[in-house]
Amino acid sequence: MTTVTRSSSANLGASQKLAVKKGDAMMSSKGISNRSNRSALGDIGNKVSNMTIDPTKKALGLPVIKKEIIQKSKFTRSKTTVSESDILLQEKESACCSRAYTIFKDAIEPIVSTVDLMDISEDKPDAFSKVLLTVEDIDANDKDNPQLVSDYVNDIYHYMRHLEETFAVKANFLEGQEVTGKMRSILIDWLCQVHHRFHLLQETLYLTVSIIDRFLQVHPISRNKLQLVGVTSMLLASKYEEMYAPEVADFVYITDNAYTKADIRTMEQTILKTLDFSFGKPLCLHFLRRNSKAGQVDATKHTLAKYLMELTIIEYDMVHCNPSIIAAAALCLSMKVLDDSQWSETLAHYSNYSEKEIYPVMQKLAQLVVKAETSKLTAVKIKYSSSRFMKISSIPELKSNAITDLVL
């Protein structure tokens, strides 16, 4: 058998080329004898190999340090050549670092500005309102009752005033529709009777009227569907406010079977979609309770204010008034009528209205009191003439000069 082998010089040439390509150091083999000698140093290899060791000489007593040679694996070898992509990456990183340093340097550099001297002259206005010194903290004694949320109550009422602007009803919103303001007043008067017969909460009635007005403002209907909208709105308000809401069959009965259960359910879906399932508009009662607490009024003044507020839900010309200003005007007029109490700074602070701001609404309320004596829409007046409501609609003070002076 013939064996084919490469020469040593051929193997050496290939190894040198590979070493140059990979950038590793080449070590010469002992078996290579035909390597050319360097003229400047002579044949170092022969001199080393021809050296003789004298056994009579002792070796120096120096410690022998052996250098551990770690052989590189294919995973630890790295190329010494740098590609163009690596250079571009290094340049980008350098640019980013430089830019970040510039931004950081600008951020920490102090801004030098001139500071004006404080004017401490006596003719300048105070830095705080002196009015707050006379305002009583009506929530100071409620901190031990977590249900009264005294820490958040001011923020809650601030948010409620924002909501009443969000869900506001425009004045004369029925203009151009088949349903008129008079038809609306008749419907609300009838719903007051239904509400009283079902023994529902006071909030349910106010929410019913709110749903009706908001729905009719954006969804015109025919007059033969107006009563359907009314009973469906009361059904929705009952589900929202009551613990035990009346059934659909109860509203079918109260309308003398003018509408079916399917009609009420269909209208319920229409109202929900139109109002986007939003029934969070604040009510007059919410603000009245807060104002009555701030004014420390008795039950008679509070009940008279409720009567005045309920007169406004029938009046079409007052649909655009916010619940907060109606509640403030009703309580202020109640205080004026019963004992001529003053609208204090505490009441102005917590109601967010001064007496001057609510005066036009007080005039309108006085007109409604006079109008209720001769109006055919008597549901509210009859309701508040019962002993349950202290017969407040029949008190002689409602015919006093405090009312008549505001009407003129």
Swiss-Prot record:
Q: Name one GO biological process term.
A: cell division
Q: Which UniProt keywords apply?
A: Cell cycle, Cell division, Cyclin, Mitosis
Q: Does the keyword Cell cycle apply?
A: yes
| InterPro entries referenced in this protein's UniProt entry, alphabetically | Cyclin, Cyclin-like_dom, Cyclin-like_sf, Cyclin_A/B-like, Cyclin_C-dom, Cyclin_N, Cyclins_cyclin-box
Top-rank taxon, per record: Eukaryota
Q: GO: which molecular function terms?
A: cyclin-dependent protein serine/threonine kinase regulator activity
> What is said about its interaction partners and assembly?
Interacts with the CDC2 protein kinase to form a serine/threonine kinase holoenzyme complex also known as maturation promoting factor (MPF). The cyclin subunit imparts substrate specificity to the complex.
Task: State its role.
Answer: Essential for the control of the cell cycle at the G2/M (mitosis) transition.
Q: Which family does it belong to?
A: Belongs to the cyclin family. Cyclin AB subfamily.
* PANTHER family listed in its UniProt record: CYCLINS
Q: What is this protein called?
A: G2/mitotic-specific cyclin-B
